[in-house]
Amino acid sequence: MTWPRQGLAKLLGIEHPIIQAPMAGASTPMLAAAVSNAGALGGFGGSDSDPEELREVVRAIRRLTDRPFIINLYVGRANPYVSAAEDERALKQALAPAHAELGAGEVPDPVDLFVSYREQAAVMLEEHVPVLSSHFGAPNADIVRALKANGTRVIVSATTVAEARHLEAAGVDAIIAQGSEAGGHRGSFAARTGHSGIGTLALVPQIVDAVSVPVIAAGGIMDGRGIAAAFNLGASGVQMGTAFVACPETAANPAYVKRLLHAEPEDAVLTNAISGRPMRVLRNKLVDLLEQHEEHCLDFPEQLSMTRNLRKVAAGTQDAEFLALWAGQGVKLARAMPAAELVQTLVAQAQELLRCHHH
């Protein structure tokens, strides 16, 4: 059976219009290749990889698949970081006991965790990456033009209709309509972040009506029911992150996966406290601790950098209480199965439902 809307699959050169969200920290070349080889679009979150690491990742994926794949990068910040000495001091004080308890040494100074977007984009051009997505807005017009001229498809997240219109004007090939149910960072860039939090069900048809490029639904989609619903809302495809975290091919910490597989939807909270930008994670001691000191929250990504040593130690000891546990509201539907099998299951479920509706 074919999908109700073919545009996106044709645009991206894939069989099934399902994108595995390129999640920084959880994605691996193995996961990306497994998903792509199954006919969907596998991805790798490269936001915190330096340019040469990124090049190696792209080549590693290409050794495992000859199919298209997607790399995600964060668009760099608009304004330089303004040091907030008082807030930094308060946070260091707040985080010191946890560092002592976990044996994580001194609380580190804040740093900008992200490499230059331009340097990363240069590697994307040199390596002819098939699909590039960006979070927190569209790359500069010159970069978008260069990527498109080079054969790379550019897709970007929008959390409001206004953002979607802005992205279409910026020349992106497709738009991810990211509902507030989504795990990880909200891709907001023009909206006053955190105020409206429009859900997927409401956002998708409004963006579909507002733009002429294909729309990819994201946020809370976990199974064939969600995929079929997205198509019925006018989407041309879906992007799913939380659904893939428990696949054995990911780099997700075992403690994170275990917590994810036992979580309730209300455990997935939207907070600025982890990174300095709104992101949905499972509530744990780290969230509680940082939320108690939310008035001292630094900018993104300096806020995230304050807990880098703590999270590193917690990852080593598999302590889920001090990890950033990215998860969307569909978390209870997460399944631990190999990525290829998950793709096949999703396709079968969705097509069964869509077949019924289209007769």
Predicted features and spans:
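Conserved active-site-proximal phosphate/metal-binding subdomains
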Residues: 96, 185-190, 194-216, 221-359
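Active-site entrance/lid segments in N-terminal catalytic domains of soluble metabolic enzymes
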Residues: 1-210, 346
